[in-house]
């Protein structure tokens, strides 16, 4: 049985940006900010507060896919980004895009999908034997989430329809033709403001010592042989 102990606890953004440096990236659900209004989404992108904004600075090329066609139109007109496609990640076979990528980024998206297996099946054609699929999703056994739930203070994401433990995520990947090669837990965005930075300074050493309880799962996979 595969050893599923996380290799460590890290910054999700730092890990992804390092892995995607000088590589050709396909970013699924690139807009992010799912609980924000349309204007807030576009403002975050224009102000370079999104992961996709940072990917454009370090990657050799980035292609973005998102189902929010209206937001994509606004981003093209207000921010000037190109290489964007409006598509449903659960229907990628309908997308007129015929190439492979070094990295397929599937970050904080799988928990939003009614049929995640359809998305994983559709991703296969964008990968070759050397491509990496990077998935992140909330950890079902995250310590802080479990504490908040016990205290009646937990709030689920507005569009979340499922959750994953490391075991469930591995099973999902295997069922759809992927082999998990690395597993970490992580925190999502870099801390902003002194209060967040203080909280991180206190919490990060604990989660580095016990990464099983980190808030977000971060898995790297390849096509199964």
Model-derived features with residue positions:
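Residues at the starts of beta-strands that form the adenosine-phosphate
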Residues: 24, 45, 60-61, 132, ...
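A short acidic, Gly/Pro-enriched loop at the edge of an enzyme's catalytic core
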Residues: 94-104
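A short SAM/SAH-binding and catalytic strip from SAM-dependent methyltransferases
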Residues: 103-115
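Class I SAM-dependent methyltransferase SAM/SAH-binding core
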Residues: 31-92
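S-adenosyl-L-methionine-dependent methyltransferase catalytic module, highlighting the catalytic core
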Residues: 2, 38, 67, 78, ...
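Conserved beta-strand/loop positions that form the S-adenosyl-L-methionine
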Residues: 28
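Conserved alpha-helix/loop element of class I SAM-dependent methyltransferases that forms part
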Residues: 6-24, 34, 45-51
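Class I S-adenosylmethionine-dependent transferase superfamily signal
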Residues: 16, 55, 123
């Amino acid at each position: 049985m595969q050893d599923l102990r996380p290799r460590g606890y890290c910054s999700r953004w730092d890990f992804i940006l390092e892995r995607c440096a000088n590589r050709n990236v396909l970013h699924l659900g690139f807009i992010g900010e799912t609980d924000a209004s349309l204007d807030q989404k576009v403002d975050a992108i224009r102000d370079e507060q999104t992961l996709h904004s940072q990917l454009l600075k370090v990657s050799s090329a980035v292609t973005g896919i998102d189902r929010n066609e209206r937001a994509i139109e606004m981003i093209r007109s207000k921010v000037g980004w190109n290489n964007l496609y409006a598509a449903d990640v659960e229907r990628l076979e309908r997308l007129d895009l015929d190439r492979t990528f070094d990295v397929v980024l599937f970050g904080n998206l799988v928990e939003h999908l009614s049929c995640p297996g359809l998305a994983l099946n559709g991703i296969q054609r964008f990968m070759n034997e050397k491509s990496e699929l990077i998935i992140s999703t909330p950890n079902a056994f995250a310590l802080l989430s479990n504490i908040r739930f016990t205290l009646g203070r937990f709030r689920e994401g507005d569009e979340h329809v499922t959750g994953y433990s490391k075991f469930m995520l591995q099973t999902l990947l295997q069922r759809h033709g992927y082999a998990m090669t690395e597993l970490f837990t992580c925190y999502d965005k870099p801390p902003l403001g002194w209060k967040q930075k203080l909280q991180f300074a206190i919490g990060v050493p604990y989660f580095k010592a016990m990464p099983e309880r980190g808030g977000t799962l971060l898995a790297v996979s390849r096509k199964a042989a």
